[in-house]
Amino acid sequence: PYAKMGYWDPDYVVKDTDVLALFRVSPQPGVDPVEASAAVAGESSTATWTVVWTDLLTACDLYRAKAYKVDAVPNTTDQYFAYIAYDIDLFEEGSIANLTASIXGXVFGFKALKALRLEDMRLPVAYLKTFQGPATGVICERERMDKFGRPFLGATVKPKLGLSGKNYGRVVYEGLKGGLDFLKDDENINSQPFMRWKERYLYSMEGVNRAIAAAGETKGHYLNVTAATMEQIYERAEFAKQLGSIIVMVDLVIGYTAIQSMAIWARKNDMILHLHRAGNSTYSRQKIHGMNFRVICKWMRMAGVDHIHAGTVVGKLEGDPVXXXXXXXXXXXXXXXXNLPQGIFFEQDWASLRKVTPVASGGIHCGQMHQLLDYLGVDVVLQFGGGTIGHPDGIQAGATANRVALESMVIARNEGRDFVAEGPQILQDAAKTCGPLQTALDLWKDISFNYTSTDTADLVETPTANV
């Protein structure tokens, strides 16, 4: 009877300092949704399965999480949105590990629930202030790169596994020389028998430095420093710094604590930190269980990464357009207002934490440039992996096609044209004087990955009359 034990309080007045969480609760048949929601509140804060006398030794009314609102999810029969408030004192300052151990620690295996999903959180300013936030942030990154008013362009070296160091460096050089700002290691290239990390760093940085000399622009290659232990990660990152790299990357799978450590290292060493969300779909893709990717975006902004993969709107990986825009908003805005159709359930003030740059990658190509610029805006890294490396005339041509497509779209935008409607025409005009772009448009004109997303918003705007 969690509800009777004080974990259900419909009259609770939310404090500015409370951490708020929204769970999608699917109770087992016969379990009352309010009771199920109170159980989630209890099991993620102070309760255990029975009443214990040691409760009397604590200020237990203060430390109980309170479920304060339960709504049925539209168009479902057995799912409910449970709003839960946690007192800020339940959490250790500046520790994502502790936050997740509480909120997502034990409740997901709870028997009274068929499934449970963490949909959104509101982190109070007082709590956010205990986190460093992004090491560099989008403003400083633009100043370091000397690139303003347009998205950054990147590409991932393909094939992701099997290249030797020298050939890997060639790919980096050609992509950057063709006009990209960044090339990146893939998430699973660390230090394998076919190419050890030091060899890759040396050849890649040679490619970067030559491309910079040729183009006169600042460029970078995301050197993946992911490794088995924190000591090895630091060793690789230090070596990358000695070679003059401006950016390193880590995978989400190294864990929240390691990511926070790397973010602190990155700020101390004036390094941009790119986070690849490797492994996130294991818990973020299903609609009824796990957690929503936007929660990870929020945690990662607190942890302090500069780039995070946030979905593409038009590519090959999972992501509903509306929700992808929202994941991007969580990363970039200074204060996000509640927006139910986008799945943003709470207002969130980010205090003075810097902004993360969202990264769009996976199955995008230059023929979609107008849509990408429209949906994602300018503070984003557009990564064309196959869209660069897969160009018939070679990597440098693929890079040039992407850069020309982007620049033509930005010029049209600056001239005040409707670049979304005129997008295909703008690209065609630009392609008249750029062979590689023409080739790319001809090759990929019809490719798009049209599957319905498994993770879509539940609350949809419905048109009302007389407005």
Swiss-Prot record:
EC numbers for this chain: 4.1.1.39
Major subcellular site: plastid
Gene Ontology CC, one term: chloroplast
Gene behind the chain: rbcL
Originating organism: Chondrus crispus (Carrageen Irish moss)
Broad enzyme group: lyase
Molecular function terms from GO: magnesium ion binding; monooxygenase activity; ribulose-bisphosphate carboxylase activity
Gene Ontology BP annotations: reductive pentose-phosphate cycle
UniProt subunit comment: Heterohexadecamer of 8 large chains and 8 small chains.
NCBIfam families hit by this protein: PRK04208.1
Protein name per its UniProtKB record: Ribulose bisphosphate carboxylase large chain
Details of cofactor binding: Binds 1 Mg(2+) ion per subunit.
Residues of the signal peptide: none
Subcellular location: Plastid, Chloroplast
N6-carboxylysine, modified sites: 184
Other remarks on this protein: The basic functional RuBisCO is composed of a large chain homodimer in a 'head-to-tail' conformation. In form I RuBisCO this homodimer is arranged in a barrel-like tetramer with the small subunits forming a tetrameric 'cap' on each end of the 'barrel'.
InterPro entries: RuBisCO (IPR033966), RuBisCo_large_chain_AS (IPR020878), RuBisCO_lsu_C (IPR000685), RuBisCO_lsu_C_sf (IPR036376), RuBisCO_lsu_fd_N (IPR017443), RuBisCO_lsu_N_sf (IPR036422), RuBisCO_lsuI (IPR020888)
